[in-house]
Structures are given as structure tokens and as C-alpha cells.
Regions:
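Histidine-centered divalent-metal-coordination microenvironment in nucleic-acid enzymes
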Residues: 245-252, 290-308
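Solvent-exposed loop and beta-edge segments used for protein-protein assembly and interaction
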Residues: 157-159, 293, 395-397
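Sequence termini and other peripheral, non-core segments
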Residues: 1-211, 402-405, 409-542
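Active-site beta-loop-alpha junctions enriched in small/polar residues
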Residues: 170, 285-287
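Helical (often loop-to-helix) elements that flank the catalytic cores of nucleotide-handling enzymes
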Residues: 302-323
Length: 542
């Protein structure tokens, strides 16, 4: 009986929430309740008819003012009921598929969402359009606000400015049962959708790890806004596990590989003309220096201002033939050239000229190799576009292009990449340096939480007892072994200031310093005499 009461209360509270958020109407209560029962494989309990027939209007307050509503917890109650009813797998992904199915049923259909969005865009209010759409995606649980709030964030002062650090705890850990099922699955058919960025994900029910094609998340509550970039249809959505404010994604309607070229730059410029309050950028289109998904052409953007955008200006340059474009070398660990112009066409042409020149540029004195004997190309760029005013604030009439020069050459000494995080930093970061990290925001793995916690305990023990064998303790601890050399160095430099209250903050600061070194590893022109001379040779060629 208690379970039945919990289901009724959870369903009715969720419906009240959906009405409050204008996802459904007051007269939808009975339909919505029965739809939730269907989703969880139930035929009861009966709803409260006094509640169902309420006629008073709920005040449409700001989305964050509905007191104490726990969307994640409410969906968990309903998902548990679905598991008990045999309507969902007893796994984390099984529960999530039910939760997304419920929220998808309570959301407006894509055509309604598009009409509402375009109505706001039609009166030249792109900020109002994205505010409304972002609010809907949060309210519907597609943007996982509760999960994102669990991320650990801080900033670290460095020679490059304040770098932003995030330990990403928002993405769910893989359930061991899902992992086992994936190992036993047979993938015999065509994979649909081809990847998680395809626009065909809109409304997709998801599938388990044991299913043909393997695990795929449920996307019933995903809504994708059709937009036009360079005359093609693209999709616009928000990221479910956002790394920064209003983290959005634009993805090609065609499942095709990433490419950084004139067409891609045109798409980026079209995007900021649609949404001048957002920046937009593309991962590089080569392995090692690209993102985790190279198979689907897409961009990432949002409302955040990254550390790179506040980097100190070092010197100015011009690009021959483009007198309306000003170029700036930024003091940034990666090699970034910034272009500015009121003239969109000139900025596009100048940026394309730099990209084409860089793709063919070889300077063996600094290890840059454009092509190897096997014909493989190694040079590309990570481009970022935004519009600013004369003070650098987002949304103005000046176009800005940031071009981070990248090279994915490998050597025997650096088999994962010469301009990739070096081995001595892999205990903190060994993954590719993609678009977000290029701009100065580290996305670090959740393993660091227990590992840094264990390192903290050993450092405090060594501080308390001069006879404590710190080196042996670190090497003998599975959580700390990879950090041993780094932790010993931190202790040698900072033991005097170390306390129980500040130990984790000190470790966080030192992690930020390592991230700065990692970005420096990724820079093709180092900040030494040889690197400065090499960069100037490239700029002079323009």
C-alpha cells in the first residue's frame, strides 16, 4: 500500500510540476496520470479526483521558484515502481530510460517547441528564444541540473591567467550489469541512430547494453531546433551534461565526419549571426588533437566566457590582402591567433588563408610536421567564433575568430602525440585536449576524487609524523601510486602551509598547475626563444 501511495503522490507531484512549467495544461491531469501509469507498467493506483478536477490556476513563477521539488528523486520513485512491475531493467540505464520516457510524454511535441522558439526568433529576440528553450530543456530533465551540480569546480591562478577546473561527476557511472550485458551482446544489424549526435535521437527510446547495437541512452525528452547553416539543415540542442553555462550543440543533419575548412567556418559565422550572444567552436578534425567524436560533424557553444578569451595580447599582425582584419598573438599555452573584423567576408577569407597555410606548414626545428611519408596530414586548427562589441562583451558587431594551431604528429618518445599531454601528467589528464580545454576549462575524470582524497591523507600523515615514509606509503596505495612523484613534490614545496582544512585546496591548486602544463604540452610554438621565432616565421608567411 505504501508503494502505491508513493506512486500516486510522485505522479501527481510530477504532473503539478509539468503544469507549473507550462509543459502541459491544467486539463491534462487525468491523461498525464494515466500516461505515467502506462510508462511504469501499472494499472493503478487510482488518482485523487479532487486533485484531478482542480480548476484554480497555478502561478507561473520563475522556473527556479517552485519550492523544494525534487525532479530527480520523483522520477526515481516512478522508475523503481517500473522495475518492480517488470516494465524496466533493474539497472541504472533501465531506470533512466523509464524516467526519460515519462518526461518525454509530458513535453510539448517537437513541432510545438519549434513554433514557440521560432516565434521568439521571428521578432528578433534570439536571447529570449534561447532562454525559453534552455529553460524547457532543464525543466524536462534533459539538461541534468541536479547531476551537473555535483561537479567539483575551482579556478587556479597561473601564468596564463585563471584556469578553470572541473572534476566531472555528472555523467553516470557505468552499471556493472550493463557492462556485462554489453560484453555478451551480438551486434548484427545496422546501428540506429548512428551516434549520439544524430538528429534521429530526438524521441529515441534508448536501448540496453544487451540489445543489438549495444547501449544507447533514451532521448524521449530531447528536442532539436532545426536551423540553417551555410544553406544546410542542422540541429540545435543543449548538452545534457553541460560543462559550462548554456552548453549547446549544433550538429549536421547528415552523419558525416568532422571537417575544419571554409564551409565549417561559414557555418560557425552563420551560427553567431543567428545567436550573437553565444560563442561557437569546432573540435579539430584529426585524431589526438580532436574531440572524442570525430565521426559526426558538430559544433559546441554557449554563453560562457573562457579564460582564453581574456588572454593578454602579446603582439599584432596582419594578413596580406585583408586590411579590414586585425590579428593578435595571445599569451596562451596553446598557439592561438585571434582575428577581429567588422567585415565578416574578410574575416572568413583571412581565417581560411591561415588554416590552409597551417595545413602545409612544416618547421622541424620545433617538431611541426605537416605531412609524413605515408601521406598522412598532421596539421589542423581548433576554431572558435564569437561576436563582441568594442569592449569585448558578447553580442556586438565585431566578429572574432580564435584559431588554435594544432599538430598530431607522434614520435617514439611521445607515441600518443608530441603536442598531447605528456606522460608525466597522465595521472591528472591523459585524454585529448579538445575544444573546451583549448579555451582553458579542464574536464577531469571522477577517479580524481578518491585519489586526491587518499593523497591528502598521506600528506597529512607525513606532516604529523616526521618518521612517516611518504614515498613508500604513496607507492603502496593503489589510489595514489600514479600520483606518487607529483605528491612528493607538492609536499616538499608546501608542507609548511599544509593543514587538514586546506590540504584538498592545495591539491586542487596543484592540479590546476598541472593542467597549465598539459595545455603547454599541446602548444606547437612554445614560449621560449625557439618557439617565439618559429611562430614569427609562420606569421611572416601570411
Amino acid at each position: 500500500m505504501a508503494v502505491m501511495t508513493d506512486v500516486r503522490e510522485a505522479a501527481q507531484n510530477l504532473i503539478e510540476y509539468a503544469i507549473h512549467r507550462s509543459m502541459i495544461g491544467h486539463d491534462d491531469r487525468i491523461w498525464a496520470y494515466n500516461t505515467i501509469l502506462e510508462c511504469i507498467g501499472a494499472t493503478g493506483p487510482a488518482l485523487d479526483m479532487a486533485w484531478a478536477l482542480k480548476t484554480e490556476k497555478i502561478s507561473l513563477l520563475h522556473p527556479d521558484t517552485l519550492p523544494d521539488f525534487d525532479l530527480e528523486g520523483t522520477l526515481a520513485v516512478l522508475s523503481e515502481a517500473a522495475v518492480a512491475n517488470g516494465a524496466a531493467e533493474d539497472t541504472a540505464s533501465g531506470r533512466d530510460r523509464i524516467a526519460m520516457r515519462i518526461m518525454g510524454a509530458l513535453m510539448p511535441r517537437p513541432s510545438v517547441v519549434n513554433e514557440e522558439f521560432n516565434g521568439r526568433m521571428g521578432v528578433n529576440e534570439p536571447r529570449a528564444a534561447t532562454d525559453w528553450f534552455y529553460g524547457l530543456c532543464c525543466d524536462a530533465g534533459y539538461v541534468r541540473r541536479a547531476a551537473i551540480a555535483r561537479n567539483i569546480k575551482w579556478s587556479t591562478p597561473t601564468n596564463w591567467g585563471d584556469l578553470e577546473i572541473t572534476i566531472n561527476l555528472s555523467k553516470p557511472e557505468k552499471d556493472p550489469r550493463d557492462i556485462a550485458a554489453a560484453g555478451a551482446a551480438k551486434n548484427t544489424g545496422e546501428k540506429y541512430p548512428a551516434c549520439q549526435l544524430c538528429i534521429e535521437n530526438e524521441g529515441y527510446p534508448g536501448r540496453s547494453a544487451a540489445a543489438d547495437g549495444g547501449a544507447h541512452p533514451a532521448r524521449q525528452n530531447l528536442r532539436v531546433i532545426p536551423i540553417k547553416l551555410d544553406g544546410e539543415r542542422w540541429g540545435f540542442q543543449y548538452s545534457p551534461y553541460a560543462y559550462f553555462n548554456e552548453h549547446c550543440i549544433a550538429m549536421s543533419s547528415e552523419h558525416r565526419p568532422m571537417h575544419v575548412d571554409r564551409k565549417g567556418l561559414t557555418c560557425l559565422l552563420d551560427f553567431v549571426d543567428l545567436f550573437p550572444h553565444y560563442f561557437i567552436g569546432s573540435n579539430a578534425d584529426l585524431p589526438i588533437v580532436g574531440g572524442s567524436i570525430l565521426s559526426h560533424d558538430h559544433f559546441q557553444g554557449g554563453a560562457h566566457e573562457f579564460p582564453m578569451m581574456h588572454a593578454t595580447e602579446v603582439s599584432q599582425f596582419s594578413v596580406t590582402g585583408f586590411d579590414q582584419v586585425s590579428g593578435t598573438v595571445l599569451q596562451w599555452p596553446l598557439s592561438v591567433l585571434r582575428l577581429r573584423s567588422h567585415d565578416r567576408a574578410q574575416l572568413l577569407d583571412a581565417a581560411e588563408k591561415i588554416i590552409l597555410a597551417w595545413r602545409e606548414w612544416t618547421d622541424e626545428s620545433v617538431g611541426v610536421i605537416a605531412h609524413t611519408a605515408d601521406g598522412a596530414a598532421h596539421n589542423t586548427v581548433t576554431p572558435v567564433i564569437r561576436r563582441v562589441d568594442s569592449r569585448g562583451n558578447a553580442g556586438g558587431e565585431i566578429y572574432e575568430a580564435y584559431l588554435a594551431l594544432r599538430c598530431n604528429i607522434t614520435t617514439d618518445e611521445h607515441p600518443l602525440g608530441v603536442f598531447h599531454p605528456h606522460a608525466e601528467h597522465h595521472h591528472i589528464k591523459k585524454e585529448n585536449i579538445g575544444l573546451i580545454e583549448v579555451m582553458g576549462l579542464a574536464i577531469l575524470p571522477p577517479r580524481l576524487v578518491p585519489e586526491l582524497g587518499a593523497v591528502r591523507e598521506h600528506l597529512l600523515a607525513a606532516k604529523a609524523d616526521a618518521s612517516y615514509d611518504l614515498a613508500s606509503a604513496l607507492e603502496g596505495d593503489d589510489l595514489c601510486r600514479s600520483h606518487a612523484a607529483w605528491a612528493k613534490d607538492v609536499f616538499a614545496r608546501r608542507a609548511d602551509e599544509l593543514t587538514a582544512d586546506n590540504a584538498i585546496d592545495i591539491l586542487h591548486e596543484e592540479v590546476g598547475v598541472v593542467f597549465g602544463h598539459v595545455l603547454d604540452n599541446a602548444g606547437v610554438f612554445k614560449w621560449d626563444e625557439a618557439g617565439r621565432a618559429a611562430q614569427q616565421r609562420f606569421i611572416d608567411s601570411l
